[in-house]
Amino acid sequence: MEKYLTKMPIKSKANEVPKEEAGVKKETPKVARKATKKDTPKELKDKENAGDDNTPKQTKGRPGRPAAKRKNLDTPDVTEKLAMEEENPPKRRSSRLTRSTRSMAEDGSPSPEKEKPEKLPFIKYKGAIKYFTESQDIAASADDVLQWVEKQKDEVVPMAFDMEWPFSFQTGPGKSAVIQICVDEKCCYIYQLTNVKKLPAALVALINHPKVRLHGVNIKNDFRKLARDFPEVTAEPLIEKCVDLGLWCNEVCETGGRWSLERLTNFIAKKAMDKSKKVRMSKWHVIPLDENQLMYAAIDVYIGQVIYRELERREKVKIKNEEEFKEKNGDAAFKAMKALGETFLTKINEVTL
C-alpha cells in the first residue's frame, strides 16, 4: 500500500531557513564597510611598496630604497683592483695616529709638531735683603750706596730698578709703594714709601748719578709713575739714560717683539720665575711686607742684574766676532751673512760664498 503512496512536499514555515541556504554565510556589514572604504594616500603608498618585488618592506616614516646589487668579487677586474690597493694603499687624512707618530709615542719622544715646553729650574736668591720703611733710614741707605758707586772705577755702574704699588679693580693703581734696587747680585735694597711724603734727597741723587745706568723691563713707565706720585723726581732725564732690557735683547740677539721679565728670564738666564698673582696683586703699601713680598721684590731686581750682565757679555762677543769676520772675509761677505740671518753670537772663522 505504501509503495503506491506519493510523498507530498511539506510546506516550510515562513520563519524557517532552507538547509541549502543556511550553509551560505552572509557577509557581515562590518566586512562590507571595509570593502567599500576609500584608501588613504598612506595605505595606497604601502600597497605600491608591497607590490614592488625589488624594494624592501616599507618602514614607518622612511621611503623604501631599492636593494643594492651585490658585487661579484670574483671577477678579474675586482680582484686586480683589490691587489693593487693592498700593495699601494690610498693616502687618507685621519685623526688617528700615523705609523710614525705611533712609534714616537711608544719610544717616548715628543712630536715634532708640538714639542713639550722645557722645564726650567726656579730662581733661588740667597743674597741679602736690606729693607727700610722710614724716611731717615732710606736716606742713610741710599747715601751708602751712592758712596759705593763713586768708588767704582768703571765709568758705568749698572743698577737694576723696579717698583711696586697696590692695585684695585674699583679704584685702579695706587701710589708708588716700593722701590727696589740691586747694584750687586749679593745684595738687594727695598725701600717702602708708605710713610714717605717726599723722597729723600740721597735717593734722588742716587738714581740721577751720571755713572749709574738704571735698567729694567718697561722701566720708562715706572719713571713716569714715580714722577707723578713724587714731584721731586723728573722723569725725562731718567728715561734718556735708562736701558730697557727687552729692547736691548732684541738688538743683541736680533729677536723681535715685546718682552716681559718672566719671558726674558726664560730666554736669557734659562730660569723660571714664580710670578704669583697673589703676591703681585698684594697690598704693597701695608707695613711691614711679609717674607713672600720681600723675596718677590728682591728677585725682580736680582734677575734683572743677571740679565744685564749676560746681555753685556753677549754684546761684547758679538762685536768681537763681527770685527774678526770682516777682517778675514771682507764687508761684502759680512753683509751677505747678515742677510742670511747670522747673529755672530758665536764665532765664525771662514765662509765660502
From Swiss-Prot:
<dbReference type="InterPro" id="IPR051132">
    <property type="entry name" value="3-5_Exonuclease_domain"/>
</dbReference>
<keyword id="KW-0460">Magnesium</keyword>
<keyword id="KW-0539">Nucleus</keyword>
<dbReference type="GO" id="GO:0046872">
    <property type="term" value="F:metal ion binding"/>
</dbReference>
<keyword id="KW-0479">Metal-binding</keyword>
<protein>
    <recommendedName>
        <fullName>3'-5' exonuclease</fullName>
        <ecNumber>3.1.11.-</ecNumber>
    </recommendedName>
</protein>
<dbReference type="GO" id="GO:0005634">
    <property type="term" value="C:nucleus"/>
</dbReference>
<feature type="region of interest" description="Disordered">
    <location>
        <begin position="1"/>
        <end position="119"/>
    </location>
</feature>
<keyword id="KW-0378">Hydrolase</keyword>
<feature type="compositionally biased region" description="Basic residues">
    <location>
        <begin position="59"/>
        <end position="70"/>
    </location>
</feature>
<keyword id="KW-0540">Nuclease</keyword>
<dbReference type="GO" id="GO:0008408">
    <property type="term" value="F:3'-5' exonuclease activity"/>
</dbReference>
<feature type="binding site">
    <location>
        <position position="162"/>
    </location>
    <ligand>
        <name>Mg(2+) 1</name>
    </ligand>
</feature>
<feature type="modified residue" description="Phosphoserine">
    <location>
        <position position="109"/>
    </location>
</feature>
<dbReference type="GO" id="GO:0008311">
    <property type="term" value="F:double-stranded DNA 3'-5' DNA exonuclease activity"/>
</dbReference>
<dbReference type="GO" id="GO:0003676">
    <property type="term" value="F:nucleic acid binding"/>
</dbReference>
<comment type="function">
    <text>Has exonuclease activity on both single-stranded and duplex templates bearing overhangs, but not blunt ended duplex DNA, and cleaves in a 3'-5' direction. Essential for the formation of DNA replication focal centers. Has an important role in maintaining genome stability.</text>
</comment>
<feature type="binding site">
    <location>
        <position position="162"/>
    </location>
    <ligand>
        <name>Mg(2+) 2</name>
    </ligand>
</feature>
<dbReference type="InterPro" id="IPR002562">
    <property type="entry name" value="3'-5'_exonuclease_dom"/>
</dbReference>
<dbReference type="InterPro" id="IPR036397">
    <property type="entry name" value="RNaseH_sf"/>
</dbReference>
<keyword id="KW-0269">Exonuclease</keyword>
<dbReference type="InterPro" id="IPR012337">
    <property type="entry name" value="RNaseH-like_sf"/>
</dbReference>
<feature type="binding site">
    <location>
        <position position="300"/>
    </location>
    <ligand>
        <name>Mg(2+) 1</name>
    </ligand>
</feature>
<feature type="modified residue" description="Phosphoserine">
    <location>
        <position position="103"/>
    </location>
</feature>
<feature type="binding site">
    <location>
        <position position="164"/>
    </location>
    <ligand>
        <name>Mg(2+) 1</name>
    </ligand>
</feature>
<feature type="modified residue" description="Phosphoserine">
    <location>
        <position position="111"/>
    </location>
</feature>
<comment type="similarity">
    <text>Belongs to the WRNexo family.</text>
</comment>
<dbReference type="GO" id="GO:0045950">
    <property type="term" value="P:negative regulation of mitotic recombination"/>
</dbReference>
<feature type="compositionally biased region" description="Basic and acidic residues">
    <location>
        <begin position="13"/>
        <end position="30"/>
    </location>
</feature>
<feature type="compositionally biased region" description="Basic and acidic residues">
    <location>
        <begin position="37"/>
        <end position="50"/>
    </location>
</feature>
<feature type="compositionally biased region" description="Basic and acidic residues">
    <location>
        <begin position="71"/>
        <end position="90"/>
    </location>
</feature>
<dbReference type="GO" id="GO:0008310">
    <property type="term" value="F:single-stranded DNA 3'-5' DNA exonuclease activity"/>
</dbReference>
<keyword id="KW-0597">Phosphoprotein</keyword>
<dbReference type="Pfam" id="PF01612">
    <property type="entry name" value="DNA_pol_A_exo1"/>
</dbReference>
<feature type="domain" description="3'-5' exonuclease">
    <location>
        <begin position="145"/>
        <end position="313"/>
    </location>
</feature>
